[in-house]
Amino acid sequence: MSRLFGTDGVRGIANTELTAELAYNLGRAGAYVLTEGTHKPKILVAKDTRISGDMLEAALVAGILSVGAEAVCLGVVPTPAVAHLTRVYGADAGVMISASHNPVEYNGIKFFDDKGYKLSDDLEDEIQRVIESGFENVPSPTGANLGREIIEKAALEDYISFAKDTIGISLEGLRVALDCANGASHEAAVRAFRELGAEIFVINDNPDGTNINENCGSTHPEELMEYVVKKKCHMGFAFDGDADRCLAVDEQGNLVDGDFILTICAKYLKELGRLKDDTLVVTVMSNLGLMIACKNEKINTAVTKVGDRYVLEEMLAKGYSLGGEQSGHIIFLDHNSTGDGLVTALQVASIVKRTGKSLFELKNVMKVLPQVLVNAKVPNNMKNIHEEDEEIIAEIKKMEAALDGCGRVLIRPSGTEPLVRVMLEGENQAEIDEMAHNLAKMIEAKCN
């Protein structure tokens, strides 16, 4: 059997790929692997607003109860709430049922350990091994030893209180627009900003089970960009379906992506002496403009592979406090163990409030360099040709010399398709367009 777990848990089309049977098996195996067995284990379970969440929750909970563990159901809350509450409630593990920014027909199951971190590959593989073994040696308790389902009504309240406490300042006087993606932030974000005194204007906060992420939220911020200007707001925030990521919009309707948010927050935290080792953790896909801005502000950058799990690994290994991705996955490790959209939005709003500067002014710390991405079709067995072919290597060096430190060439093989992605950044859009297309053609020609 191929690997069940992807980069962010188990994901697939609900009821055909991610079936109730698979959810039951994951609940049963996960509860067995993630608990010590010396006490009655407690596992938190939450979901986003997808229609398939109820079906998968029922099956997952049944699996958890079948090995004698307690399932504590939190209802609809953001993914980062599960990470936070797993620690606060002293649970053995947490599970989120969500497919994040994906369309409604998809769903996913993601586990957190007792410290609120996503599982290691080894633990995920062990869960899969237990399922594939037919649950060999996994107990099937009876009578009083079966597990119980507990409904935790205070979960949302507890998470909102935590998020508000991360800024310690009133947001009175700020006009803030929120796009909740008809997802898990539709109560948490609205209540947090309102309770902190902001005047809020909300769109896409009416989930019906089928409209999550539908032309809204962080993957479609266009409506919010217009709405912020129309309502004369100081800023806006767009969340994805499970609210582990967030993008911002300034008062002029410009998108403020994860690179801008990271740079703004890093600069502010450094000034307060709260940016560990004056270092920001980013991925190779962050715009070169971020690197230049950080250099100007005397902020070090640690660069990882693409994926928030690699950002987190680097942060934990070195003790860094801030990291994230252009997509809006921002990790404030002093506050939470995973990307947290609401915490991110509140940090940005509090910086605007404390500095007295507009978001447009704050984002001027960084200038985005033009970026172009071209796909080159290559056979799966030739995805490293750019590292092996002498002519291609020479051409890349020539391009980098022409960009003269004000641009870069990055080639990334796709993990799922027979292609490599040729990315160039530089000051001249027309120049890098031509370079990228020429390099992609050269790579394709060498493969044929």
From Swiss-Prot:
A single GO cellular-component term on record: cytosol
Assigned keywords, A-Z: Isomerase, Magnesium, Metal-binding, Phosphoprotein
Cofactor(s) this protein requires: Mg(2+)
EC numbers: 5.4.2.10
Membrane spanning residue stretches: none
CDD domains: GlmM
PTM field: Activated by phosphorylation.
Residue list for modification Phosphoserine: S100
BP term (GO), one: carbohydrate metabolic process
Alphabetical list of InterPro entries matching this protein: A-D-PHexomutase_a/b/a-I, A-D-PHexomutase_a/b/a-I/II/III, A-D-PHexomutase_a/b/a-II, A-D-PHexomutase_a/b/a-III, A-D-PHexomutase_C, A-D-PHexomutase_C_sf, A-D-PHexomutase_CS, Alpha-D-phosphohexomutase_SF
Enzymatic class: isomerase
Catalytic machinery residues: S100
Reactions catalysed: alpha-D-glucosamine 1-phosphate = D-glucosamine 6-phosphate
Family named by the database record: Belongs to the phosphohexose mutase family.
UniProt function note: Catalyzes the conversion of glucosamine-6-phosphate to glucosamine-1-phosphate.
Family matches, as HAMAP family: GlmM_B
NCBIfam families on file: glmM, PRK10887.1
Name of this protein: Phosphoglucosamine mutase
